């Protein structure tokens, strides 16, 4: 149903998370043969983006992830899913093109709410069968990326809150 040449056995999914532009992070989850491969999950602190810019954040993490895999000679996934619509997808796809791997790795965007699937260079969304297995699988993977990213974001936010509260106490905080 996803119009792929081969059934994907190795899938990676990306999700960004921030609170009004602060503590921007992203997550990459990896599924192999339909099961989470938690040891391969990755968190990313967004380094190059100030404020709220999901597209720039997506470009940064996709570039960091796949330039590293290429450098290490690590096999690329059979499918990349980005949490988001056309904008996030085209940001990620642009990076894959720049790295020279856009023709080697299929990529889709999955927009929440209507569960629309977007393909590069196609302005119209594709709707998978609501009861079909492909939609259930990619939604499960996307939701896992979201959960993993939100958990990391909360940890980072909580840690930053504690640090800043202690820093403001005279004699305890930074000198």
Q: What residue ranges belong to the model's regions?
A:
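Acidic, glycine-enriched active-site microenvironments
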Residues: 1-175
């Amino acid at each position: 149903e996803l119009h792929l040449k081969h059934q994907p056995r190795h899938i990676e999914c990306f999700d960004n998370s921030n609170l009004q532009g602060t503590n921007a992070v992203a997550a990459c989850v990896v599924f192999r043969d339909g099961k989470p491969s938690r040891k391969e999950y990755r968190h990313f602190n967004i380094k190059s983006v100030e404020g709220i810019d999901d597209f720039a954040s997506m470009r940064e993490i996709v570039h960091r992830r796949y330039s590293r895999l290429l450098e290490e000679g690590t096999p690329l996934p059979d499918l990349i899913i980005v949490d988001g619509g056309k904008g996030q997808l085209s940001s990620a796809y642009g990076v894959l093109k720049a790295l020279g791997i856009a023709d080697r790795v299929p990529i889709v965007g999955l927009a929440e709410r209507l569960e629309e699937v977007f393909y590069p260079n196609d302005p119209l969304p594709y709707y998978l069968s609501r009861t079909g297995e492909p939609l259930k699988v990619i939604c499960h993977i996307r939701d896992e990326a979201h959960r993993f990213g939100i958990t990391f974001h909360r940890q980072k936010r909580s840690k930053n809150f504690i640090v800043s509260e202690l820093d403001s106490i005279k004699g305890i905080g930074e000198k």
